[in-house]
A protein has these predicted regions:
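Iron-sulfur-associated redox domains of electron-transfer enzymes in respiratory
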Residues: 1-362
């Protein structure tokens, strides 16, 4: 509230993929009516200056993480494999405390939340022509662990304080909407601001278990084959099982992948890798059963597990999106051309990657 009232501050807010499938549940509006564009309208009424989509930085994450996986896979005799996804801070913390010898298997790519913060306070500040210290970055997340991640002391690569200043959960945003006496039933749909409001269907499925893997494989295929696969070619990684595995052909090379959600399943998977009964190249793990759609910051329905219902909303949004591939997001392409140069460039490494060994635990 202080930042919203401070005229010297430019308040920028990002909305995570899974939030759009759940924000209306505790406000008494149907999932069909509670579109992300109505949430954008509510946040404008609250007073945010610019409203962006974390799906933009999910696409950016895919470009970095997918490129990193291909580098490791090419050099697999010497590289740390399997490569684990790194966008779930609950999972990263679990590895650090339970399996510290496997931290090097984590992708160094930051999560979409943290990539967004770094880009907002560098590239976007540059586009606005303002000092980065004026940008106050808020994220709306389905996850309580994102508060920990935003506060990790090394997460300030943009050089203007923490890259993400405040994290609000979906439940907290619902309370904010109520506190501002905004009637959700009367909201009209409004568009995200540009250019960090453009995203692909691959970005939106980050909110479902298996979504990060599927999005990464879509772009990895393009990067090695030079052409797009069928957008649904990798949908075998979808499903309700807590631990799923599949193998795919990437331009003649067999890639073995696994997806797990829930830390009990993560533990079983890691133990199987350790004792040699399972062998993978790329593994996605989310701490919450069902992935971010079932995150700890989402609305709670007594006796109901809604993660998979919410995931179906996200897959539906992917299906109707004109963009199905992260590498085709025009705003991501422009961000590389004007600022980052290319995936895994020196600037990309500085702003979009992290060493999880340096994360303090508290």
């Amino acid at each position: 509230f202080d930042a919203l009232a401070d005229e010297s501050k430019i308040t920028v807010v990002q909305i995570a993929p899974a939030v759009r499938a759940a924000w209306g549940e505790s406000l008494g509006i149907s999932r069909e009516f509670a579109t992300v564009k109505r949430l954008v309208a509510a946040l404008r009424k609250v007073g945010f200056d610019y409203i962006f989509d974390t799906n933009f930085s999910a696409d950016l994450t895919i470009m970095e993480e997918g490129s990193e996986f291909l580098e490791r896979f090419k050099n697999r005799k010497n590289a740390k494999l399997p490569m684990f996804t790194s966008c779930c801070p609950g999972w990263v913390r679990f590895v650090k405390t339970q399996y510290p010898d496997m931290v090097d298997n984590l992708s160094t790519a930051k999560s979409p939340q943290q990539m967004f913060g770094a880009i907002a306070k560098t590239y976007y500040a540059q586009l606005l022509g303002v000092d980065p210290s004026r940008i106050f970055c808020v994220s709306i997340m389905p996850c309580t662990a994102k508060k920990y991640e935003a506060g990790v002391s090394v997460m300030k690569d943009a050089g203007a304080g923490q890259d993400v200043d405040v994290v609000l959960t979906t439940r907290e945003v619902d309370r904010l909407i109520r506190a501002e006496h905004i009637n959700p039933h009367t909201l009209e749909e409004e568009e995200f601001d540009m250019p960090l409001g453009v995203s692909s269907g691959a970005g939106v499925i980050f909110g479902a278990t298996g979504g990060v893997m599927e999005a990464a494989l879509r772009s990895a295929y393009y990067l090695v084959a030079g052409q797009n696969p069928d957008p649904d070619a990798f949908k075998d990684v979808r499903g309700r099982e807590g631990w799923r595995e599949a193998s795919f052909n990437l331009n003649g090379a067999k890639v073995r992948v696994a997806v797990a959600s829930g830390l009990g399943n993560a533990r079983k998977l890691i133990e199987a890798i350790r004792n040699g009964t399972a062998e993978y190249d790329f593994v996605e793990i989310m701490a919450c059963p069902g992935g971010c759609a079932g995150g700890g910051g989402q609305p709670i329905a007594d006796g109901k597990e809604l993660a998979y219902e919410r995931a179906e909303v996200l897959y539906g949004l992917d299906k109707i999106n004109n963009l199905r591939f992260s590498h085709e997001n025009p705003s991501v392409i422009k961000c590389y051309e004007e600022f980052l140069e290319k995936p895994l460039s020196h600037k990309s490494h500085k702003l979009l990657h992290t060493d999880q060994k340096s994360w303090e635990l508290w």
